[in-house]
Amino acid sequence: LSNMGVVKNAVSGFLGVGDKTYTNAKGKSEFMSTAGLKAADVKSASYTLSGGKYTYTLVLNNGSSYADSANKKNNSPVDRSGILVGTGDKSAFDHKCAANLYTAINNTDGASVKSVRESSSNVKCVAVVNASNGRLERLTVSFDFAVTLTNTKYVVTIKNAGGSASTSVKYSGFKF
């Protein structure tokens, strides 16, 4: 059981727990993708104008994802907000769906997991736009998430393990 801290640290890393800063060169957007939100993903939307800046706020519906060896399902609006980039596990992902976690854990040094369930809630996207030139100045996506791992193996077998966290992803310093 002395290795349990290693398991916790590895899983926390896969989940994106912790502080990370990435810098893109002008004209690059490796850590953002095109948003694909649908009207049904949005719980509420509002905007304000103050000090020459528009602040747009979208509150998204809760979502979930699931992965095992045969199935990968994802109905998580946060993943359609533009912060889930690519497939597989990469530390640049700001939110990891169950499929990302399943692949990452099963490709880690001697570790395996039978299935992964992930859920997100309290998702809020806030964009600040300069009213005079229409340029995006700041984007923040905040959400709570919880993960349950079934039959996780790493030195020992853990029938069920889980955790939850709150996070905020902040983008700023856009270059045009």
What is each stretch, according to the model?
Residues 1-176:
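Subset-of-secretome marker
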